[in-house]
Amino acid sequence: MSGELLYYRSGDGLIATGHIDGNGLFSHLADGRLSDGWTRIVPVGRELLFYRDDNGVIATGRLGRDGIYTNLADGKLSDGWDQIVPLGRELLFYRNDTGTIATGRLGTNGTYVNLADGTLSTGWTRIVPLGRELLFYRSDTGRIATGRLDTNGIYTNLADGTLGTGWTRIVPLGRELLFYRSDTGRIATGRLDTN
């Protein structure tokens, strides 16, 4: 794993950037300041989408290989999105309480374009991207669902099932998934096929 990193402190907007090389060595690159209060920062290619869930304000920017952050655009979306999941240049927005979803695309110029709106089941605690596919998980029931988001922002449900309850982290690694429980340290692995 190698690439640039952005560290953000929401209380005062301080940022620091760094780089991890192919050997895992970290190098500090730059320091700066952004607006405070961002609740979500989502990477989309080299661009970043900043989101405030209390008022829906967004900003987009680009992190250069030199660690310098450049602001690209500002805008506004609906407030209250609990999860924002990137899939290529597209984004899936999800509200846990209503199941409302919206999809959009972030251009390389930082412009956000809404693509589609819809509704899914409520209560998903984790939404994990794997290529164009998504794994939805409810930690209280173990319920899962999988689906696909196309480049036009259209979501298609693929399958439903169940896993164990209580997984607190689900990490994608290619087509494989690592499941982790913070209370017990238990792990499990799985694979999502393309069907």
Q: Which residues are covered by each model-predicted region?
A:
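Trp/Gly-enriched beta-strand/coil motifs that build multi-repeat beta-propeller-like domains
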Residues: M1-N195
